[in-house]
Amino acid sequence: MKRNEQKWRISMEKTELKLGLQPFWFWNGDMKKEEIVSQILEMKAKGIPGFMIHPRQGMEVPYMSKEFFDRVRLAVQTAKENDMEVWLYDEYPYPSGICGGEVILEHPEYCNKHLEKVVRMAAGGERVQLKALWGRVLLARAYRVKQDGSYSLDDYVDLQDYVGTGYKQEVFQYSGLTLYNKKRYFTGDLVKLLDWTAPEVNAGESFKIYFVTEVVTKHFKYFENFIDTLNPDALRYFIELTHERYKKEIGEEFGRTVKGVFTDEITAFPDRQPWSPLLPGEVKKRQGIDLIDNLPALWEDFGELSTRVRYAYWNTATDMFLEAYDMQVQKWCHENGILYIGEKPILRSKQLQYFDVPGIDAGHQKVGSVARMFIGKYRANGKMVASAAHFYDKPAALCEVGHSVGWGMTMQDMKWMFDFLGVLGIDFLTIHGFYYTANALKKYDAPPSPFYQMPWWEDASEIAGYAKKMGQFLQTTKRDAKFLVIDPVTSAWVSDRETETRLKDDFAALQSQLMFHGLDYYIIDPDLFETGEVVKKGGKVWFSIHGDAYETIILPPVRNLEKGTFHKLLEFIREGGAVCGLY
């Protein structure tokens, strides 16, 4: 950064948030009222300006019960008396969206589902029996494979009529109606069973069978199942069960002591391949593509067809998630006078515009290791979230930090993490996490707890004060960023797993080199890039957006660009603008 007062923007209006450490406060024990008050006073004494009430595994009072809200009310009142902020973590324990399991208990139709596929080659005349996990059959087709190994999704035999119910488990056990026979044979574990004999084909030809079912997700973290995060009705019910109940109990402090809601980890699930029964219809409506007919193109390379299908799939799933979750939660929070903050997987950076304080999950390291400032994982990219905070006029950029560093974490470790996050533009530090108790197994919940359990806690005001000053410095300065880097997210969407990994690694390596050489930059979502303007000033061509002007646009290795982005970039080039393209 340059200390040039003409270039720096003083933005004291952004300091209305209490800066410094704002820890998750894990409510993971008996939650005695006197202990709640005592721990809040401990935080206050060390300069901690606020906390996030995080119902956590191990909590001994029932979530969302009268006993629970009695304690929430006490914590809010104590914070109010001590001029501290309170944030409400919106789940028990995580990820957000299910109200401790209540959403799908009351509405099982909102259960999360995912795709399971069985793929098999079959020779002409061969009998094929395939078992797919129990669920609604979406696709059962045998595609005719030519001698050169190629095949078309338009040339197939429909196998739906060859599918029925079967079982995959045989059971032999002691059980019987009479004493004469105590041994019984049973079957279990329902499956969808396909039984088909392929017709004869020419020499060198064969069939490729795709058998795809829509399966209810099981064994999902704490809840066995999860919700359909693309279904707006499911998320509307989550808000009713969670946010509305907090409003009923402590709504009088919304916008005062209670500053907002923190949401965590929720995304379009399953994260590697989002699904919803609503998705095919929305892809058809928004993109004009029949997703079911083209499912194999999600997994295999059919050239341009795969590119179009994958883009339509990911773009639609992303928009559906934003509409179902982010937009609804943000709207509710704003209507009720509180902020919507948090961190979760980043499908594309434009989704961060809906957070009032956008966040990431990074910085879980100790001094002596190499700072992982840039990795392929968007959710850990501090520069991406700081860029979003800049472009979308957010008061801060947040990071959940200190997760799983271990009980040996020191204040030196914390300062080092804060420093490299600060370089990236992070000025709101959410510590993971302050334990109400570290008794018994609870000490193993992604430690440490940099709270009263630590031998250095008596000096914790030093690290709290440092974090506060760092945040104030960052919020009252303007970065001297001369480069604009276009997010290559849509190229990752349309690529196979290996290519996607390479593109993300290249994107991370580019950012690392820019920072290493002192070349500051912002990352911009292609959707936002389209809204910029090409201007000529002082004999130079600039790209203007958000009141800033950039001489150089950097295009990381990409495989495609959205139409609006392509034409805006082309306009900049034709006017004489500088574009640095990498491959």
List the model feature ranges, each with a label.
Residues 5-7, 40, 44-46:
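N-terminal regions that are enriched for targeting/export leaders
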Residues 4, 17-22, 26, 32-38, ...:
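Carbohydrate-binding surfaces of carbohydrate-active enzymes
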Residues 198-232, 351-372, 554:
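Aromatic- and acid-rich polysaccharide-binding/catalytic face
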Residues 174-186, 192-195, 202-214:
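Surface-exposed interaction regions enriched in Ser/Thr/Asp/Glu
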